[in-house]
């Protein structure tokens, strides 16, 4: 049987909790990351208690000095949780009482509950974590834009259904991975509008009768506002679910980029060579160079999705207000952040060091009759309805396949036999360079549009960095 010595609760109980309950309730193994935020919030709470007339100036200063000492010891690792500590809050109160005594240390608990306390600390931690993750995503975007800028005219096979479709610029394809990552960062920046609301002062669920000032503590802690509803403030974790969704979406977007790298690095594709420092070998096959970073990105995306779904399952069907189920809200989010902080620098390094075989990509770009659409559109420009033009281009492909030649190698008579408008001049559009250059509307793969797009992506990344620092 455990005791309640040092616990934040217990007066109503004759005995401490059973050992199995104490073990089940324990959370210091994961919530200790909140300790620095708890110390900062406790300082703000001490000042609010003083302004409410619940502490003398001497008591306030004594608490602040004790919290300063405790914060320093937490930062350098000389103070940490004991086996007997239930959670980060109890451990820190124990540390404060060790420094200032039980009479003064016990005064800090006035007007706050672990319910509003942990909801506030979780938001503080997550707002900082989101900025770190966003910075990491922008590093990957930076690697993509640098590679795009280094290959402004390289042509590659564009694919749908993993089948050769139309020629595109390599830079266009790389930027297609940058855009969703920028949207992820935009979501993280927008997330802060909803996360920047302070639950402090909500108490267990009903607010406080002690004349506290939730707006003052919200401002001191860097929140935009205090919560309007104390029940919602202590019981809601939609902010955590929102962040977990964006983290999982980042994982999905990185996984799609990773899949391209994996395919491109195969012998069959041969588009890229992996840098030695960003790949691994085989324990038995000496020739192997494995895309482990990309494969781990695929694997971790599943983990991130699992964290999101696990959190949502925890949140569903809880009655208002706070329930102990919410002890399970933090580990999935903490883990998602930890995984992304491992993955993002590795992905940025992988992308930045890819060596592209642009000759190989250019050689493969026209294969599979990828210029058939150009034939159809050439006919449309000559007044042929697209349905008819599509049929004619398909017939030209069938004829070329039957002879084992390219579209440009069909005889004039063969072209005319397919459609009277298919004259020898159609060969003018049967080059990958001409195909790419012709797609010069906004969003297209023409070099002029891709150059504009590259500048816009870089501008967007710079603006997102500024938003994240506000």
Swiss-Prot record:
Catalytic activity: 2-(N(omega)-L-arginino)succinate = fumarate + L-arginine
Listed pathway(s): Amino-acid biosynthesis; L-arginine biosynthesis; L-arginine from L-ornithine and carbamoyl phosphate: step 3/3
Cellular component terms (Gene Ontology): cytosol
Record-linked PROSITE patterns: FUMARATE_LYASES (PS00163)
GO biological process, one term: L-arginine biosynthetic process
GO molecular function: argininosuccinate lyase activity
Location in or out of the cell: Cytoplasm
Broad EC category: lyase
Known EC number: 4.3.2.1
Annotated keywords: Amino-acid biosynthesis, Arginine biosynthesis, Cytoplasm, Lyase
A Pfam short name: Lyase_1
Gene3D superfamilies: Fumarase/aspartase (C-terminal domain), Fumarase/aspartase (Central domain), Fumarase/aspartase (N-terminal domain)
Similarity comment: family membership: Belongs to the lyase 1 family. Argininosuccinate lyase subfamily.
Protein name: Argininosuccinate lyase
Provenance organism: Mycolicibacterium gilvum (strain PYR-GCK) (Mycobacterium gilvum (strain PYR-GCK))
High-level lineage: Bacteria, Bacillati, Actinomycetota, Actinomycetes, Mycobacteriales
Annotated gene: argH
């Amino acid at each position: 049987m455990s005791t309640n010595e040092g616990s934040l609760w217990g007066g109503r109980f004759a005995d401490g909790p059973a050992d199995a309950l104490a073990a089940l309730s324990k959370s210091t193994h994961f919530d200790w990351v909140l300790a620095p935020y708890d110390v900062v919030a406790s300082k703000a709470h001490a000042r609010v208690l003083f302004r409410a007339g619940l502490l003398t100036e001497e008591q306030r200063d004594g608490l602040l000095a004790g919290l300063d000492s405790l914060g320093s010891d937490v930062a350098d690792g000389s103070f940490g949780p004991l086996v007997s500590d239930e959670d980060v809050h109890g451990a820190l109160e124990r540390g404060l009482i060790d420094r200032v005594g039980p009479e003064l240390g016990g005064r800090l608990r006035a007007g706050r509950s672990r319910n509003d306390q942990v909801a506030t600390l979780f938001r503080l931690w997550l707002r900082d974590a989101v900025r770190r993750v966003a910075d990491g995503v922008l590093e990957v975007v930076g690697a993509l834009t640098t590679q795009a800028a280094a290959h402004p005219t390289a042509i590659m096979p564009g694919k749908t259904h993993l089948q050769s479709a139309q020629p595109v610029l390599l830079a266009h394809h790389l930027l297609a991975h940058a855009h969703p990552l920028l949207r992820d960062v935009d979501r993280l920046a927008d997330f802060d509008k909803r996360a920047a609301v302070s639950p402090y002062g909500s108490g267990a669920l009903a607010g406080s009768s002690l004349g506290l000032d939730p707006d003052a503590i919200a401002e001191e802690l860097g929140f935009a506002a205090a919560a309007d509803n104390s029940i919602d403030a202590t019981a809601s974790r939609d902010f955590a679910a929102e962040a977990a969704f964006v983290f999982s979406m980042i994982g999905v977007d990185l996984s799609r980029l990773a899949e391209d790298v994996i395919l491109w690095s195969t012998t069959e594709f041969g588009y890229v060579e992996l840098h030695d420092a960003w790949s691994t070998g085989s324990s038995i096959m000496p020739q192997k160079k494995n895309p482990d970073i990309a494969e781990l990105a695929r694997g971790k995306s599943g983990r991130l999705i699992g964290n999101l779904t696990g959190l949502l399952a925890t949140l569903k069907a809880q009655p208002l207000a706070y329930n102990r189920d919410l002890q399970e809200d933090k580990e999935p989010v903490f883990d998602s952040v930890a995984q992304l902080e491992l993955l993002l620098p590795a992905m940025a390094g992988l992308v930045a060091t890819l060596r592209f075989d642009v000759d190989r990509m250019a050689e493969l770009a026209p294969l599979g009759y990828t210029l058939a659409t150009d034939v159809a559109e050439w006919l449309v420009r000559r007044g042929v309805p697209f349905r008819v033009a599509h049929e004619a281009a398909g017939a030209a492909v069938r004829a070329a396949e039957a002879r084992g030649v390219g579209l440009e190698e069909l005889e004039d008579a063969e072209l005319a036999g397919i459609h009277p408008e298919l004259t020898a001049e159609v060969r003018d559009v049967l080059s990958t360079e001409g195909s790419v250059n012709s797609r010069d509307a906004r969003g297209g793969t023409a070099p002029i549009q891709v150059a504009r797009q590259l500048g816009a992506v870089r501008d967007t990344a710079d603006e997102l960095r500024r938003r994240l620092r506000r």
